[in-house]
A protein has these predicted regions:
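Structural core segment of the AMP-binding/adenylate-forming
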Residues: 4-5, 31-97
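Conserved AMP-binding loop of ANL adenylate-forming enzymes
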Residues: 14, 152-172
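Conserved S/T- and glycine-rich ATP-binding loop of Class I adenylate-forming
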Residues: 12, 29, 60, 119, ...
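Conserved AMP-binding A3 loop
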Residues: 120-146
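Conserved AMP-binding/adenylate-forming
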Residues: 1-43
């Protein structure tokens, strides 16, 4: 659906509390749509505005807490921002639309070719000593991290992991 919206190869932000829908949004972007830009949920509106502009985000998945600020930023025509996608209700609609596209024979997302050297994750440093900086990661960086950890840990379907860190700042 994101590809159908014209977001193939574009930068798409994700902001919100740690939750299942955050991960679904993240993976739907990074696994064949474009570049994911995880955003710090604790940023004040002016810093959020700055990151949206600097990263050239065209769409953002968000939770209800950020709706008012993001609508204001969208109305102000900040950067390239065009779409706001709520994790509260629109995500289910997007999934249904995606299923319809697949039934109609659209396999653009399923058959997406991923360039493992191309940047598809854009992180921002916390900016504790100065303005936050962009860290560009490729799909290869991501997969290498997973392969390394799986060679150390014996993970199976019975395992449970607890994360208390903000999800935008870590990959677990």
């Amino acid at each position: 659906v994101l590809i159908d919206m014209g977001l193939k190869g574009k930068r798409i932000g994700v902001i919100g509390e740690n939750r299942y829908e955050w991960e679904i949004a993240y993976l739907s972007i990074v696994c064949g749509t474009g570049t994911v830009v995880p955003l710090d949920k604790s940023l004040p509106e002016n810093e959020l505005r700055s990151l949206i502009e600097r990263s050239e985000i065209e769409a953002i998945f968000y939770t209800k807490k950020y709706e008012e600020s993001l609508k204001k930023i969208l109305e102000e025509k900040v950067g390239k921002l065009k779409y706001l996608i709520s994790m509260e209700n629109e995500e289910q609609e997007l999934i249904k639309k995606g299923e319809q596209l697949i039934k109609q024979g659209n396999r653009e997302f399923i058959d997406a070719k991923i360039d493992n050297e191309k940047m598809n994750i854009m992180l921002f440093t916390s900016g504790t000593t100065s303005a936050s900086k962009i860290v560009a990661l490729s799909h290869k960086n991501l997969v290498s991290n997973l392969m390394d950890i799986s060679s150390i840990l014996d993970v199976n379907s019975d395992d449970v992991f607890l994360s208390f860190l903000p999800i935008h700042h870590v990959f677990e």
